[in-house]
Amino acid sequence: VSTAEFTFLGFLPHKKGRETLFKEIASSERAMVFYESTHRILKTLESLEKHTPKFKVVIARELTKVFEEFIEGTPAEVLEYLNTNKEKQRGEFVVIVVPR
């Protein structure tokens, strides 16, 4: 993943402005990095699939811990992986969205 230029967003808003932010991510030419909770990771991937279906997504799960893991693909591919592997839906997530 090229991270020569990226924007760090912190945690995304819960409701107000969330869809607007996904539209901004879709129109960006730089990588976007943000945190996501275990309770919202699937909804976030669904929104990314809607707004950025061809972008590359990397989910960094449990960074700096024993079970650190990186999952990458399109939003649909990552969503399918997490739906198939329910135990992977837990933990702390860093999400990187990269335009193609």
Please state what every model-predicted region is:
Residues 30-31, 35-100:
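A contiguous loop/helix-start segment that scaffolds small-molecule binding in enzyme catalytic cores
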